């Protein structure tokens, strides 16, 4: 009975990835998305003597990061990282889209923001949305989405980033970053 009740829980669809949803199992994700370019297991540092913060060691948390290169997203190509919880359920998606200039970065930011807003409003269980400015210079957007029948909001951040150290690789200097996650 409990198993069937868990299977009937509606999942929250990710924006820009219509075949993916939060809490999706690792197996289902791999069936839809295929093999990752790289899989990384999260490690954290702890101390054997916590009182004095001595004798550090690393341990695996069980969280997994699936990295994909050359992901096509609304006419743009970038790289994506999907984060899975300790119970191996999808909890976050991050996409980096490289652009060639600051001007192109602003154009892509505006286009993606409008596309994301339309996709949010088209979700079948869409209820409401608020938009805040985010980013170092308040030059990005945070869409806080409330869905019917859900207690937790999910947020989508769309903002420009700049790598100051990327002098040689000009096409990697400017990017647009899109994060999707649920607020607890």
Language-model-detected regions and their locations in the chain:
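An acidic-aromatic pocket/loop used at catalytic or ligand-binding sites
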Residues: 139-184
């Amino acid at each position: 009975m409990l198993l069937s009740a868990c299977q009937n829980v509606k999942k929250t669809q990710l924006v820009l990835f219509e075949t993916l949803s939060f809490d999706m199992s690792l197996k289902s994700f791999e069936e839809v998305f295929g093999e990752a370019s790289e899989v990384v297991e999260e490690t954290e540092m702890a101390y054997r003597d916590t009182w004095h913060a001595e004798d550090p060691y690393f341990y695996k948390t069980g969280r997994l990061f699936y990295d994909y290169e050359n992901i096509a997203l609304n006419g743009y190509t970038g790289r994506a990282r999907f984060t899975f919880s300790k119970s191996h359920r999808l909890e976050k998606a991050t996409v980096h889209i490289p652009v060639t200039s600051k001007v192109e970065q602003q154009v892509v930011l505006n286009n993606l923001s409008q596309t994301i807003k339309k996709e949010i409003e088209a979700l079948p269980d869409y209820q409401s949305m608020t938009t805040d400015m985010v980013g170092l210079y308040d030059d990005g957007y945070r869409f806080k989405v409330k869905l019917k029948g859900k207690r937790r909001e999910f947020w989508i951040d769309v903002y420009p980033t700049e790598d100051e150290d990327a002098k040689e690789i000009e096409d990697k200097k400017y990017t647009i970053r899109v994060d999707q996650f649920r607020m607890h």
